[in-house]
UniProtKB/Swiss-Prot annotation:
Residues 96-407 form the IF rod domain. Residues 132-144 are annotated as: Linker 1. This is Neurofilament medium polypeptide. Residues 2-99 are annotated as: Head. PANTHER family: NEUROFILAMENT HEAVY POLYPEPTIDE, NEUROFILAMENT TRIPLET H PROTEIN. The gene is NEFM. Residues 22-57, 478-788 are annotated as: Disordered. Keywords: Acetylation, Cell projection, Coiled coil, Cytoplasm, Cytoskeleton, Glycoprotein, Intermediate filament, Phosphoprotein. Pfam families: Filament (PF00038), Filament_head (PF04732). One of its GO terms (molecular function) is structural constituent of cytoskeleton. Belongs to the intermediate filament family. The keyword Coiled coil applies. Residues 525-541, 556-572, 602-623, 651-664, 675-727, 744-771 have a biased composition (Basic and acidic residues).
């Protein structure tokens, strides 16, 4: 208990002490009942005093102070009252008396309270002294207890020491007991051995006793025989004596005989005794020998038994140790089996958890793939929108830059067929986008994006190679620029001559074209088989469905393109031949001429296709540019071979990419090119050939050797030479387009007026240029070419344009060419639009084909 050092008069101290005393008195277990009663009385008094202290302890001082103040005030009042009057003095005195009486009463009460509190303080001091004595007694008891605890701890240590000693003794005793047990076991074994030997000896003694009994019986029988023989002998002797007595000399004989019998009996007795002694001696010797042999055998057996017992004991110890080891091994085996079972359970649980996590991750991966595909589709849509906007912006820029030249130069009907051809390409691009959206697998979209990046590098490498080849070809083109002018004139003359021949060969050309188309289809099938070997059946079904859809769309686009091409070419045919032949004639004559030109162009198309195939093969083996240069040497063939690199080479990849090429030969120039963008996803078959050995074919057509050649020659060569080359190409293109369009001249003769309108054609020209730029930029924005490499790709597309465009070397090159040669330049513009479509669609096809190949592998 802790006691505060506050003064005893402090009310807080009193309150605390009274409360502690009350609690202590209630909780105390002291033996004095009087103390208990006193504490209870104190507790009651303390409660009263505490309540009084809490309430009225501070009252005396305040009351006393108030009385003092009141007395002072009363004195003041009395003084004032003396001044004021006697009445007031009386009242004041009476008031003072009352106040003094009250103060006296209060003072008496305070004095009583003080006495009571002093008495209570004395009691508290006495109780405190008692408590201090108790506390001192407890401290002494604590010391005593500590001493006892020390003693007990020492005793405990001693006991623990004794216990350890006893444990050691017990261990030693156990060891002694173990040794005694071993000795006891040894003694027991020795006892058993001795008992066994004793039993054996007893058996031998029994056997000896039996033998002795037999010998006794024999002795008895011999004695009986001796007695019998003795009796017989006596009888015989008696008979003899009787016979002797019958004679005279009986007495003497009897004496003699008697002496003889006694001696004989003595001798016989001596012999029998000797014989019995001899037999006894022999029996003893035999028994001794037998006993010695048995003892020797017993000793030997004892040693053997002892060694055997030692071996048995050793074996027992080994057996015991082995049994202990076996038990330990069994325990370890059981523990290992339990551990193994636990591990298997944990492993199974882990497997289940891992499988669950794998399923969850697969589901999440599937969801992320779907989301990625959705984002990619959205990205593709945005890219397409961006491409369209970029193309429109570029087209508007070109239109603004070359607006005056175009209005002056292209007032004719040049751009009508271009617009018609461009329009299907735009529709095809839209259908292609729809196909991308339709494709459900998201892996395909992902890998498409990756393959676009890979194709980027490939296209850049190819373009770098093409630039090297173009640099060499540019020099050749510069040297042959003068020859090209003469060749153009010769080409025009030969074109006129070939028109007559082409009419006859039109039928043969159609048959040959059909054969070539069939061969191309076979090649496509072979390539598609090689590409589809690693693909799944689902992809083949999807490719077939896409191919059918692409064929239908291409058929529609080709129909529209043929109609537009026929209209435009019908309008163009008279001016195309206006410089060499005559001004435009009546529509009937123009149609007849167009038919002739179509026949001539059919033969040229066949030649161009053959040249294109050869050029494609040569491009695969070596550089793609070589077949184009020799074609430039000849007047008409150079022009036509320039076509094969652009339209026909572009068509050959389309043949490889889609089965629709039976219709392509007539529409070699444009209709299939717009249709090709639909094929980029059906052409998944060519995708594989691009990755195997054959992929160079689609690449070479995309980089048509001639188109890039015009690009490079345009840079080094003058614009006039470029214009001449463009004129040759435009003539060939016009022939091809005329072949396609004039086949349907009879059906579409009425539609010439619609295409003849210069304004409509100009609008179509602008739209086609925009679409061509859109396709080129679309291919670029797909991730393949965003740098000047894309501009080169556009030039490659434009090269055939560029041969027309190179004169300016900038954006509006086509307008200058059209100024030089109106009709042919218009046809060249057709080629430009077509070539742009070819390049763009080919690039897109590469991207899609790569994506399809990765899908098949996965």
């Amino acid at each position: 208990m802790s006691y505060t050092m506050e003064p005893l008069g402090n009310p807080s101290y009193r309150r605390v002490m009274t409360e502690t005393r009350a609690t202590y008195s209630r909780a105390s277990a002291s033996p004095s009942s009087g103390f208990r009663s006193q504490s209870w009385s104190r507790g009651s008094g303390s409660t009263v005093s505490s309540s009084y202290k809490r309430t009225n302890l501070g009252a005396p001082r305040t009351a006393y102070g108030s009385t003092v103040l009141s007395s002072a005030e009363s004195l003041d009042v009395s003084q004032s009252s003396l001044l004021n009057g006697a009445a007031e003095l009386k009242l004041s005195r009476s008031n003072e008396k009352e106040q003094l009486q009250g103060l006296n009463d209060r003072f008496a009460g305070y004095i009583e309270k003080v006495h009571y509190l002093e008495q209570q303080n004395k009691e508290i001091e006495a109780e405190l002294a008692a408590l201090r004595q108790k506390h001192a007694g407890r401290a002494q008891l604590g010391d005593a207890y500590e001493q006892e605890l020390r003693e007990l701890r020492g005793a405990l240590e001693q006991v623990s020491h004794e216990k350890a000693q006893i444990q050691l003794d017990s261990e030693h005793i156990e060891e002694d007991i173990q040794r005694l047990r071993e000795r006891f076991e040894d003694e027991a074994r020795l006892r058993d051995e001795t008992e066994a030997t004793i039993a054996a000896l007893r058996k031998e003694m029994e056997e000896a006793s039996l033998m002795r009994a037999e010998l006794d019986k024999k002795v008895q029988s011999l004695q009986d025989e001796v007695a019998f023989l003795r009796g017989n002998h006596e009888e015989e002797v008696a008979e003899l004596l009787a016979q002797l007595q019958a004679s005279h000399a009986t007495v003497e004989r009897k004496d003699y005989l008697k002496t003889d019998l006694t001696t004989a009996l003595k001798e016989i007795r001596a012999q029998l005794e000797c014989q019995s002694d001899h037999n006894m001696h022999q029996a003893e010797e035999w028994f001794k020998c037998r006993y010695a042999k048995l003892t020797e055998a017993a000793e030997q057996n004892k040693e053997a038994i002892r060694s055997a017992k030692e071996e048995i004991a050793e074996y027992r110890r080994q057996l015991q140790s082995k049994s202990i080891e076996l038990e330990s091994v069994r325990g370890t085996k059981e523990s290992l089996e339990r551990q193994l079972s636990d591990i298997e359970e944990r492993h199974n649980n882990d497997l289940t958890t891992y499988q669950d996590t794998i399923h969850q991750l697969e589901n999440e991966l599937r969801g992320t793939k779907w989301e990625m595909a959705r984002h990619l589709r959205e990205y593709q849509d945005l890219l397409n929108v961006k491409m369209a906007l970029d193309i429109e912006i570029a087209a508007y820029r070109k239109l603004l830059e070359g607006e005056e030249t175009r209005f002056s130069a292209f007032s004719g009907s040049i751009t009508g067929p271009i617009f018609t051809h461009r329009q299907p390409s735009v529709t095809i691009a839209s259908t292609k986008i729809q196909k991308t959206k339709i494709e459900p697998p998201k892996l395909k979209v992902q890998h498409k994006f990756v393959e676009e990046i890979i194709e980027e590098t490939k296209v850049e490498d190819e373009k770098s190679e093409m630039e090297d080849a173009l640099s060499a070809i540019a020099e050749e083109m510069a040297a042959k620029a003068q020859e090209e002018e003469q060749e153009e004139e010769k080409a025009e003359e030969e074109a006129v001559e070939e028109e007559a021949v082409s009419e006859k060969a039109a039928e043969q050309a159609a048959e040959e074209e059909e054969k070539e188309e069939e061969e191309a289809e076979e090649e496509e099938a072979a390539k598609s088989d090689a590409a589809e070997e690693g693909g799944s059946k689902k992809e083949e079904i999807e490719e077939k469905e896409e191919g059918e859809e692409a064929e239908e769309e291409e058929a529609e686009a080709k129909g529209k393109a043929e109609e537009a091409g026929a209209k435009v070419e019908k309008v163009k045919s008279p001016p195309a031949k206006s410089p060499p032949k005559s001004p435009p004639k009546s529509p009937v004559t123009e149609q007849a001429k167009a038919v002739q030109k179509a026949a001539a162009e059919v033969g040229k198309d066949q030649k161009a296709e053959k040249a294109a195939e050869k050029a494609a093969k040569e491009e695969k083996a070596a550089s793609p540019e070589k077949p184009a240069t020799p074609k430039v040497t000849s007047p008409e063939k150079p022009a036509t071979p320039e076509k094969p690199p652009t339209p026909e080479k572009a068509i050959t990849p389309e043949k490889v990419r889609s089965p629709e090429k039976p219709t392509t030969p007539e529409k070699v120039v444009s209709p299939e090119k717009p249709a090709s963008p639909e094929k980029p996803r059906t052409p998944e078959k060519p995708a594989s050939p691009e990755k195997p050995a054959t992929p160079e074919k689609p690449r070479t057509p995309e980089k048509p050797a001639t188109p890039e050649k015009p690009r490079s020659p345009e840079k080094p060569s003058s614009p006039l030479k470029d214009e001449k080359a463009v004129v040759e190409e435009s003539i060939t293109v016009t022939k091809v387009t005329k072949v396609t369009a004039e086949v349907e001249v009879s059906k579409e003769a009425r539609k010439e007026d619609i295409a003849v309108n210069g304004e409509v054609e100009e609008k179509k020209d602008e739209a086609k240029e925009k679409e061509a730029e859109e396709e080129e930029k679309g291919v670029v924005t797909n991730g393949l070419d965003v740098s000047p490499v894309d501009e080169k790709g556009e030039k490659v597309v434009v090269t055939k344009k560029a041969e027309k465009i190179t004169s300016e070397g900038g954006d509006s090159t086509t307008t200058y060419i059209t100024k030089s040669v109106t009709v042919t330049q218009k046809v060249e513009e057709h080629e430009e639009s077509f070539e742009e479509k070819l390049v763009s669609t080919k690039k897109v096809e590469k991207v899609t084909s790569h994506a399809v190949v990765k899908e098949i592998k996965e």
